[in-house]
Amino acid sequence: MKAVHFGAGNIGRGFIGALLVDAGYEVTFVDVNEKIIDALNERNEYKVTVAGERKETETVTNVRGINSKTNEKEAIDAIAEADIVTTAVGPTVLPYIAKTIAQGLKQRTASKPVNMIACENAIRATSQLKKDVLSHLSEEETTALLKDAGFADAAVDRIVPNVQSDDILHVTVEPFFEWVVEKPALKGDAVQLGKAVLVEDLAPYIERKLFTVNTGHAVAAYVGYRKGKKTIKEALADDYIKHRVRGALNETKAMLVEEYQFDAEAHEDYIDKILLRFQNPHLEDLVERVGRGPIRKLGPADRLVKPAKYLAEKGLHPESLAETIFDALHFYAEGDPESEELRALVDEKGYVDAFCEISKLEKDHPLVEIVAKE
């Protein structure tokens, strides 16, 4: 079985790529990072350290790489032969790889199933990828393609920090992982996804993860940044920051329990588990890494604004989320284009107007009024 995975970064190698190899696939990583691609082709393997109570290092084999910047034709050919195509490139990059995927799918001659799964921290990223891919195809090509091509949304969860290593391919991950895939959208009777969990309805899993794991991580990062903390572990050692994270997750819990009828007690246990993961003593996750991309993370459907908006519109006061939104408007990470853009926007318009533009909310929206008081 053959898999093509876009994104040979830490998440691609340490999470999705490793799971695909474990499920029996030969994995071709597609990326523009020349050094990583060259190293993959030189060795055809890499090491993953699982940082639990005992550090265990595994070797992931049966891998290779393609530089899509210099060898796009080779990437297209690989897609034409693949059984599965996955991504971990960041949601904003999906439109840029869609044309290559479309060309590879058009080139397929065998009438066998192929499935696309975008493994991104965004709601229904595969659905977005599908739109982007189909925009490069004619109506006839689309009809023919969709007979054999599945586009399955997924929820992904694993902390993969940037850990310094002399080995460019070595990656460190936490023991916990969750890859949940929407089963009805898959094509083929026996899709091999190994340790992935296949579910009939993905929506609850996407939102539970986004509004617990990603929200909690964001709160720790943005509050930690303003408090001068360097790592998430250091941030959560501060009782004030831990209180802020717990407060925000209690607010998102209220939304999730009402929207999806999650058991409140079970969800509280889930929050406890997430907080323990964030405090893993064997992981050094940088505040700057977690906070990067603040404009996307302040978007109307993302981890902070969506739950805060939901609660504010019900007449509730999402204090912890609103405080974090205000903290996020101060965030800056060197080398992060969105940080540069955010700083320029705030300098030009001020915090409240900048927030309105990013969140697509009117100035008289109850959430904006709460944030303005911060």
UniProtKB/Swiss-Prot annotation:
It is an enzyme of class 1 (oxidoreductase). Signal peptide: none annotated. NAD(+) binds at residues 3-14. Its EC number is 1.1.1.17. HAMAP family: Mannitol_dehydrog (MF_00196). One of its GO terms (biological process) is mannitol catabolic process. Pfam families: Mannitol_dh (PF01232), Mannitol_dh_C (PF08125). This is Mannitol-1-phosphate 5-dehydrogenase. It catalyses: D-mannitol 1-phosphate + NAD(+) = beta-D-fructose 6-phosphate + NADH + H(+). Belongs to the mannitol dehydrogenase family. Keywords: NAD, Oxidoreductase. One of its GO terms (molecular function) is mannitol-1-phosphate 5-dehydrogenase activity. GO terms for cellular component: cytosol.
